[in-house]
Amino acid sequence: MNTYQNVEAITRMVLEAMEAGKTEKPRIKVPIGISARHIHLTQEDVEKLFGEGYQLTKRSELMGGQFASNEQCTIVGLKLRAIENVRILGPVRSKSQVEISATDARTLGVKAPTRQSGDIAGSAPIALVGPKGAIYLKEGCIVAARHIHMPPADAEVAGFKDGDMVSVRMGDERGALLEQVKIRVDESFTLEMHIDTDEANAAQLKTGDAVVIK
């Protein structure tokens, strides 16, 4: 290859790299929110656990119109292993579900699949015990899949749409690259990535720390 061909080849490589750079999404920093085990209930199940006509009472506001309630109950696995004081989130939903970590699943002795919230078809059974009664869910116990909440304005700037899957670099010395992180876009959201306690502990992260979308 002569000098002219060398220059031509290098020029072509540079132009291709520049063109690729134009389509590359910007590196977005996202604050972390650590999601502890929690419960979503139908109004019918609220009343079974807490009494007829009972309404959940608000403890603190969460994004997306949700709130952490003052109410808690005990969850019980198939081998009668229990975890007490699991918080209930409101408002009530059309189907009851329990979201736990993989460590919780082992503690309870349940085979909870990793799913996005609301995707409970064929998931693990679980029992819930409240002050006024108990319920048994034939399905509804899941390990919540990691995801990023993003308002439309941020999604537009970053070039993402609802349902996109991304990779995220998290942590420093004991950091990790998490793949298959789902982008969820909604007007009610603020920018935040939700991970469970297992993932946070593995990367030594705390609420408010930032991760980077790759």
Positions of PLM-derived features:
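Short beta-strand-centered segments at strand-helix junctions
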Residues: 31-33, 38-79, 84-131, 136-163, ...
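Short structural boundary motif marking the start of a folded domain
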Residues: 26-30
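Short, low-complexity, charged amphipathic interaction modules
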Residues: 1-24
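C-terminal edge-of-domain segments
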Residues: 212-214
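Acidic, glycine-rich active-site loops and adjacent beta-strand->loop/helix elements
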Residues: 172
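Short coil-to-beta-strand transition motifs
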Residues: 175-177
